[in-house]
């Protein structure tokens, strides 16, 4: 590889919106993320079920579709 053209690869402190902090390697010294393995529903096992039927009924009522 040519010297002087690649970004510096360093330890990166990552902070999640839920408060979880961990370190990875990146070309940035720190990052903030919205979701991580501590708060993502896939990893936590808690799913949020959307009330799709209620939304459809609300739409039909709003536009008088019967």
From Swiss-Prot:
Keywords: Metal-binding, Ribonucleoprotein, Ribosomal protein, RNA-binding, rRNA-binding, Zinc. SUPFAM superfamilies: L28p-like (SSF143800). GO terms for molecular function: metal ion binding; rRNA binding; structural constituent of ribosome. The keyword Metal-binding applies. Its cofactor is Zn(2+). GO terms for cellular component: ribonucleoprotein complex; ribosome. One of its GO terms (biological process) is translation. Zn(2+) binds at residues 16, 18, 36, 39. Binds 1 zinc ion per subunit. The keyword rRNA-binding applies. PROSITE patterns: RIBOSOMAL_L31 (PS01143). It holds the Pfam family Ribosomal_L31. Part of the 50S ribosomal subunit. NCBIfam families: L31, PRK00019.1, PRK00528.1. Binds the 23S rRNA. PANTHER family: 50S RIBOSOMAL PROTEIN L31, CHLOROPLASTIC, LARGE RIBOSOMAL SUBUNIT PROTEIN BL31A. Belongs to the bacterial ribosomal protein bL31 family. Type A subfamily. This is Large ribosomal subunit protein bL31. It comes from Sulfurovum sp. (strain NBC37-1). The gene is rpmE.
């Amino acid at each position: 590889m040519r010297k002087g053209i690649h970004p510096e690869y360093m330890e990166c402190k990552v902070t999640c919106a839920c408060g979880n902090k961990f370190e990875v390697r990146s070309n940035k010294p720190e990052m903030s993320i919205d979701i991580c393995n501590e708060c993502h529903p896939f990893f936590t096992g808690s799913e949020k079920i959307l009330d799709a039927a209620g939304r459809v009924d609300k739409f039909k009522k709003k536009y008088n579709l019967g």
